Structure formats: structure tokens, C-alpha cells
């Protein structure tokens, strides 16, 4: 599998842990081992620009997902086909503020946002209460499986 992290944020982040998390999520959700994922870490001005271009919303946000091949989770008998899952942009500066407000570490927030972004790439959403319950439940399950501890509280709506 090809999971690349490009850190343009100017903030030191444990990139190896983000890659390990993505691999864990890929394995748990039966994503093809050759699927590709790009994780871009950007500063607030760059995230604000992306947020405006992609969502037509002002201001920096925590995470943005740009799916490519519209892949969905697989099963043990039928993994997801090979393809480009997509790109995730994460802003460590926004993550730091959200982590502080939620009472957990910035790295835990980065793991939360990366998991959240991957789930969006796989078609999960949280626009209505049922979708939110499914997505956030899976997000917690994946994070707890990866870290071996209780998942950080969600900071996104």
C-alpha cells in the first residue's frame, strides 16, 4: 500500500504513527493493499485556501477529504479493489486548539482527524444522526483498536 505524508505545516508531527494508523484502518476495513492515500499536513492559511476552494466556506478547518476512486470498505472475502483512495488535508494548528479544548493531546487529535478523513474517503458521513452514529462509532472502534486506549472525544460536529 502506498501511504504518503507530506508535511508542509511547519509543525513537527509523528508522521510514522499517522502512516501506521492508516495501514491499520486499511487492514481493518479490508482496503486493497495497493490502494493509495495521500496525507497532506498544512498550515492555517493553506487550509483556509483549501476550505474555500473545496467547500466554499471561509476559515481554516481541521480536516478535508478529497476522494478519488470512490472506494468503499471491503469484506474478508472481497477486499476493496485497487485504486486511489484519495487525499486528506489536516491542519496541525487547528488540531492543537481542538485538542486543548477537548482535553487530550495534539497527537491524539491528529490520529482522530486522520481516521475521520479516511472514513470520509470511504463514503462515510455524519450529516444526519444515524450516519453520525455509524461513522463516529466506527471511528472510536478503530482508534481504540489502534491505540489500545479509550478514543479521544470527537471534536468535529
Swiss-Prot record:
The EC class name is hydrolase
Q: Does the keyword Signal apply?
A: no
| Cofactor note as given | Binds 1 zinc ion.
PROSITE patterns, per database record: UPF0054
> What role is this protein assigned?
Single strand-specific metallo-endoribonuclease involved in late-stage 70S ribosome quality control and in maturation of the 3' terminus of the 16S rRNA.
| Species name | Arthrobacter sp. (strain FB24)
Q: Which GO terms describe its molecular function?
A: metalloendopeptidase activity; RNA endonuclease activity; zinc ion binding
Name of this chain's protein: Endoribonuclease YbeY
Amino acid at each position: 500500500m502506498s501511504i504518503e505524508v507530506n508535511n508542509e505545516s511547519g509543525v513537527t508531527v509523528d508522521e510514522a504513527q499517522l502512516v501506521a494508523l492508516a495501514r491499520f484502518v486499511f487492514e481493518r476495513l479490508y482496503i486493497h493493499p495497493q490502494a493509495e492515500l495521500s496525507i497532506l499536513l498544512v498550515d492555517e492559511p493553506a487550509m483556509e485556501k483549501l476550505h474555500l476552494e473545496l467547500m466554499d466556506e471561509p476559515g481554516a478547518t481541521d480536516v478535508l477529504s478529497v476522494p478519488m476512486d470512490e472506494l468503499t470498505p471491503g469484506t474478508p472475502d472481497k477486499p476493496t479493489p485497487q485504486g486511489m483512495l484519495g487525499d486528506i488535508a489536516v491542519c496541525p494548528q487547528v488540531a492543537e486548539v481542538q485538542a486543548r479544548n477537548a482535553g487530550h493531546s495534539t497527537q491524539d487529535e491528529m490520529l482522530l482527524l486522520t481516521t475521520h478523513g479516511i472514513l470520509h474517503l470511504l463514503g462515510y458521513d455524519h450529516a444526519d444522526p444515524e450516519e453520525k452514529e455509524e461513522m463516529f462509532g466506527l471511528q472510536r472502534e478503530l482508534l481504540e483498536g489502534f491505540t489500545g486506549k479509550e478514543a479521544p472525544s470527537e471534536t468535529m460536529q
